[in-house]
């Protein structure tokens, strides 16, 4: 693979995460405007965004098999066509059914692109370099999560219609589409070059189960936590502005942590540092949940920084459980994380209704403790060390 080709594929991976981050995180900014547009209460409007999450989940799950049937370049180019249709649907339709369909299509495009982006990084890089590259790729999710809400605020403050926010997000996919030209993608399944040697089927092992549970609990815990921090902070007497600042600080610290750990991870065994970070994150979340408002800003900054590398390291370790990175395995771990996203309000909504926001935060804390236990148990069964030894010779 030529260096310029590798750079193009790496940028496609970066932008695939930016696309998903923009679509998922901008929701809170535009929901009120969309509710007014359709003359609906915000509470019923929020349910239609489940179509976005469902599209992401279904496409990540199915793409484990689709990757071996449909070439990656074809998928990305077809995704561009779907993106144009979805944004056009949002712009020219006043029907809630068509809005929901467009959201589902955006989710499908986003999920397919993100699963391809993840696979490209696991395919191009090995060992500890794979972990640091995946982490840097994941930081584009947070970066888009910071940039696009600012773009949305800028547009909405000038009374520009909400759908132009999605048109701006569509420009990320335009960049991906342009990068596919003159770029060679790894061939998979029936498109892969034929070899005389039979392909050995590798068993995944119990380590993949531990990592999948950790991925689900981590994302469910993280989103369950950050979704209810503003309500919890307001309950302690903080202003809405200060509560929002807590969330912004978390994501800013998370992004800085990703950049720092993309360098730091190269010097440590991934399973060991993952266990330490998961334990630290559980402790810092407990400090936030039980601390005074005066200390909340510092504890959430520390939590964002030290938890930033957890999810990507889980995916990296998953890809290292087999000698050759398996798209099915990587997508399985990703799917488990996406299920965590889907379950966020299903799990935390009733808890908040019965016991208040702090109970949801303590539930998230318990989920982080489960992540720590899974990472600790992984140390006894993980195959990443033997595969790293093989690839380094």
Swiss-Prot record:
Periplasmic side: 32-50, 99-100, 155-161, 227-244, 294-296, 353-360
Keyword Cell membrane set for record: yes
Principal cellular location given in the protein's record: membrane
Keyword check for Cell inner membrane: yes
Membrane topology qualifier: Multi-pass membrane protein
Cytoplasmic side of membrane: 1-10, 72-77, 122-133, 183-205, 266-272, 318-331, 382-393
Alphabetical list of Pfam families matching this protein: MFS_1 (PF07690)
GO MF entry, a single one: transmembrane transporter activity
Superkingdom per UniProt: Bacteria
Keywords in alphabetical order: Cell inner membrane, Cell membrane, Membrane, Transmembrane, Transmembrane helix
Gene3D superfamilies in UniProt: MFS general substrate transporter like domains
GO CC, one annotated term: plasma membrane
Transmembrane segments: 11-31, 51-71, 78-98, 101-121, 134-154, 162-182, 206-226, 245-265, 273-293, 297-317, 332-352, 361-381
Cellular compartments annotated: Cell inner membrane
NCBIfam families (alphabetical): PRK03699.1
PANTHER family named in the record: L-FUCOSE-PROTON SYMPORTER, PROTEIN TSGA
Family statement: Belongs to the major facilitator superfamily. TsgA family.
Protein name: Protein TsgA
Species of provenance: Escherichia coli O157:H7
């Amino acid at each position: 693979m030529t260096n310029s080709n590798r750079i193009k594929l790496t940028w496609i991976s970066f932008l695939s995460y930016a696309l998903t981050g923009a679509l998922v995180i901008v929701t809170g900014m535009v929901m009120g405007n969309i509710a007014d547009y359709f003359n609906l209460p915000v509470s019923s409007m929020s349910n239609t965004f489940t179509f976005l999450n469902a599209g992401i989940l279904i496409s990540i799950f199915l793409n484990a098999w689709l990757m071996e049937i449909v070439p990656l370049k074809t998928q990305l180019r077809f995704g561009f066509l779907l993106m144009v249709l979805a944004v056009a649907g949002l712009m020219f339709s006043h029907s809630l059914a068509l809005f929901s369909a467009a959201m589902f299509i955006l989710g499908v495009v986003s999920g397919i692109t993100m699963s391809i982006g993840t696979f490209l990084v696991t395919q191009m890089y090995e060992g500890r370099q794979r972990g640091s590259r995946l982490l840097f790729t994941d930081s584009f999710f947070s970066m888009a999560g910071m940039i696009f809400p600012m773009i949305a605020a800028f547009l909405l403050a000038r009374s520009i219609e909400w759908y132009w926010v999605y048109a701006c997000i569509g420009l990320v996919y335009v960049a991906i589409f342009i990068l596919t030209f003159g770029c060679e993608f790894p061939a998979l399944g029936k498109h892969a070059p034929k070899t005389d040697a039979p392909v050995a089927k590798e068993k995944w092992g119990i380590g993949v189960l531990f990592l999948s549970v950790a991925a689900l609990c981590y994302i469910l815990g993280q989103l369950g936590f950050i979704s209810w921090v503003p309500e919890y902070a307001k309950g302690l007497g903080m202003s809405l502005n200060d509560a929002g600042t807590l969330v912004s600080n978390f994501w800013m610290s998370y992004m800085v942590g990703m950049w720092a750990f993309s360098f730091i991870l190269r010097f440590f065994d991934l399973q060991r540092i993952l266990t330490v970070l998961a334990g630290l994150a559980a402790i810092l979340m407990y400090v936030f949940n039980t601390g005074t408002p005066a200390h909340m800003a510092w504890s959430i900054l520390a939590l964002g920084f030290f938890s930033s590398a957890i999810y990507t390291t889980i995916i990296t370790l998953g890809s290292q459980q087999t000698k050759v990175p398996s798209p099915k395995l990587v997508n399985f771990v990703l799917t488990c994380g996406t299920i965590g996203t889907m379950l966020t309000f299903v799990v935390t909504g009733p808890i908040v209704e019965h016991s208040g926001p702090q109970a949801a935060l303590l539930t998230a804390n318990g989920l982080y403790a489960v992540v720590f236990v899974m990472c600790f148990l992984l140390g006894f069964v993980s195959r990443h060390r033997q595969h790293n030894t093989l690839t380094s010779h």
